[in-house]
Regions:
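Generic structural signal for beta-strand residues in well-ordered domains
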Residues: 9-11, 40, 171, 187, ...
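A generic secondary-structure micro-motif detector
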Residues: 53-54, 170, 208
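Residue-level preference for short coil/turn positions at secondary-structure junctions
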Residues: 12-14, 43-44, 174, 180, ...
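A short, structure-level motif marking secondary-structure boundaries and short turns
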Residues: 48-50, 175-176, 203
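Acidic, Ser/Thr-rich low-complexity intrinsically disordered segments
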Residues: 143-196
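FMN-binding flavodoxin-like domain, especially the glycine-rich phosphate-binding loop
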Residues: 1-8, 12-21, 25-165, 232-237, ...
């Protein structure tokens, strides 16, 4: 996705399209939204979504559906899969899961995969896995992300300037919370794994350029655990899927 998201248009000859993404802030990552906004000729495609979440899926699938509809398509089904939480800034001790707990989640995913495969193979429609719908809709109706969320998250990230950007636009500024410590050896892995080329190496040290997606790849993949976010991540457990290697992250095809 990162290699094609900046094209003027994206098209495929496939009859079935699957969109797999992590839930960010109860919604769809900006990069996924940009990707879908460039998709053409999807009105006759069977489109399904799979979201992974560490906390709650919320109504991410409803947001995905709206974005797809804006391009003339229709989301047939949307599935949600529980995976380890890896946004380690909040309540670190409450979010970390043991290796054993991770393995149970992976078992759950493999079992879920079977049902997703059957559903897609049968071209089923109308299944949307969500949670906290009433609360999520209230957040939207009362514009709580704009009124409260934007201020809270920017403050936590250390961005103190006034901005008229929307909450979702402000995510790119939340990289203000990233910094490196004395363990940094200038290996450049952080800049290489960033899916949007948001990290520039200056004097052999990372500098974030305010195009952030908040995926935390830089923090999670740093071999020295030298990248921190705010003041609460030092010493915190890092996580990425054990079957994913750094070579996978560096491949952009």
């Amino acid at each position: 996705m990162a290699t094609v998201v900046n094209r003027e248009s994206v098209s495929t000859g496939a009859d079935v399209i699957g969109i797999v993404f992590p839930v960010y802030h109860g919604g769809v990552p900006n990069i996924v939204g940009r990707f879908i906004s460039r998709m053409d000729d999807i009105n006759n495609k069977y489109i399904f979504g799979v979201c992974t979440y560490g906390d709650e899926p919320g109504i991410a699938m409803k947001y995905l559906s709206r974005t797809i509809e804006s391009r003339g398509g229709k989301l047939a089904s949307g599935f949600a899969v529980k995976m380890p939480y890896n946004y380690i800034d909040f309540s670190r001790s409450l979010r970390e899961v043991s290796v054993e707990e991770q393995q149970e989640m992976f078992k759950g995913w493999r079992k879920k995969l079977e049902s997703i495969h059957k559903s897609v193979d049968a071209r089923e429609t109308g299944r949307f896995e969500t949670s906290l719908e009433t609360l999520s809709k209230m957040v939207d109706t009362l514009r709580l992300r704009e009124i409260v969320g934007k201020r809270v998250w920017l403050k936590r990230a250390g961005f103190v300037e006034h901005t008229d950007l929307t909450f979702w636009e402000c995510i790119q500024l939340m990289d203000s919370g990233f910094q490196y410590d004395e363990e940094c050896n200038g290996c450049d892995i952080c800049s290489k794994v960033c899916p949007v080329s948001n990290i520039k190496m200056i004097d052999n040290r990372p500098s974030w350029q305010h195009r952030c997606e908040q995926c935390f790849a830089c923090l999670q993949w740093c071999p020295k655990e030298a990248i921190q976010f705010g003041s609460r991540t030092s010493g915190g457990k890092r996580y990425h899927h054990p079957d994913v290697k750094i070579s996978d992250m560096l491949r952009r095809d």
